[in-house]
Amino acid sequence: SVGFKAGVKDYRLTYYTPEYQTKDTDILAAFRVTPQPGVPPEEAGAAVAAESSTGTWTTVWTDGLTSLDRYKGRCYDIEPVPGEENQFIAYVAYPLDLFEEGSVTNLFTSIVGNVFGFKALRALRLEDLRIPPAYSKTFQGPPHGIQVERDKLNKYGRPLLGCTIKPKLGLSAKNYGRAVYECLRGGLDFTKDDENVNSQPFMRWRDRFLFCAEAIYKAQTETGEIKGHYLNATAGTCEEMMKRAVFARELGVPIVMHDYLTGGFTANTSLAHYCRDNGLLLHIHRAMHAVIDRQRNHGMHFRVLAKALRMSGGDHIHAGTVVGKLEGEREVTLGFVDLLRDDFIEKDRSRGIYFTQDWVSMPGVLPVASGDIHVWHMPALTEIFGDDSVLQFGGGTLGHPWGNAPGAVANRVALEACVQARNEGRDLAREGNEVIREASKWSP
């Protein structure tokens, strides 16, 4: 006779283990689970643990050939979400050995690969992941990190300034380079390729790289500052992406750029390794993130994508703006900004941080505030993001009635004024606009 009965069995018998003590090497996940009516929360939580680790819908005889106790994911805690009917946070612990070392791709394939289409769940959202040092240490992480970047650029004690070149599609390479030069000459540290600028018929990548490099060197000579332009190396194949990164390095420019979600984590990690080996900084754009993180009840929170990027590698990443949005959102955004920059981040549910995260010595990533911001937001941005950030004004630079260079000057003057006022102990939240008004009187 066989040692088990055929048929569908309850997951919670095997995968719901409230007495489990989590190990330091476990990867922990917090899922927001919305079960279908009639499905008990323990069963839903256990189903998530099972389907994202060793489980399948029935018992198979090959289960006897492995040690489930050693390899199974475990749902070790379930708590109702306050104010929501029939919604729970399920905490799942995964043994370290379920994941390939140094592969964000494999981490996501396992944890979020299959389980989101599961019938017993109405919706499922991955809110946070605790990455143990035992796993994070298998990644290179950011090519350089915040401190090394400051040393390379020789810029200290203030946020960095950027600008996306607009109109994002349609300019010729020559005119594009001209806009880059004007912005950098006016006082910005960086200009940026838009995320959808790759290599289109109106502007091929090689021409753009060339004219942008010319703009960078000209602006550097005239200002005596180090300048950069995020040359977007994203391409249709990994080989083509690497070809573009190599060409950028041959031109001697300081930084390239990648769209890490559309390009994929495998491509991103390869590029990050190349960037460290060759002294290039890497700017990361999060195109496609809202497809994954916009829904409150389903998908993945951006803080998970941010942690994944820190492991995969990038020196800058776009992180929203916080300005003009709701207060609660500010706390949550600052939560994942800290996850990007700091070595050790305490668990704090009010900021959406479900687990204490210890990055040990992995370099940090500079958060980039970009999108719909302009010079009058400068006091708030300086205060919220602090010095370790990149503030990007696209239309807020190029939309200046006098032109690109005066737009760049305005941003730089405002930034320097805000930083100085803050260092003198003035309250930017209250006096910010006044600070900028005073500065503009003396600005050329």
UniProtKB/Swiss-Prot annotation:
Gene of this entry: rbcL
GO MF terms, alphabetically ordered: magnesium ion binding; monooxygenase activity; ribulose-bisphosphate carboxylase activity
Broad class of where this protein is predominantly found: plastid
Family the UniProt entry places it in: Belongs to the RuBisCO large chain family. Type I subfamily.
Post-translational modification: The disulfide bond which can form in the large chain dimeric partners within the hexadecamer appears to be associated with oxidative stress and protein turnover.
Cofactor note: Binds 1 Mg(2+) ion per subunit.
Sites where the protein binds Mg(2+): K192, D194, E195
Modified residues (N6,N6,N6-trimethyllysine): K5
Lineage of producing organism: Eukaryota, Viridiplantae, Streptophyta, Embryophyta, Tracheophyta
RNA-binding is among the record's keywords: no
E.C. designation(s): 4.1.1.39
Active site: K166, H285
Organism: Ginkgo biloba
SUPFAM superfamilies in the cross-refs: RuBisCo, C-terminal domain, RuBisCO, large subunit, small (N-terminal) domain
HAMAP family per record: RuBisCO_L_type1
NCBIfam families named in the record: PRK04208.1
Catalytic activity from the UniProt record: 2 (2R)-3-phosphoglycerate + 2 H(+) = D-ribulose 1,5-bisphosphate + CO2 + H2O; D-ribulose 1,5-bisphosphate + O2 = 2-phosphoglycolate + (2R)-3-phosphoglycerate + 2 H(+)
Residue(s) carrying N6-carboxylysine: K192
Protein name: Ribulose bisphosphate carboxylase large chain
Binding site for substrate: N114, T164, K168, R286, H318, S370
Domain of life, per lineage: Eukaryota
Pfam families: RuBisCO_large, RuBisCO_large_N
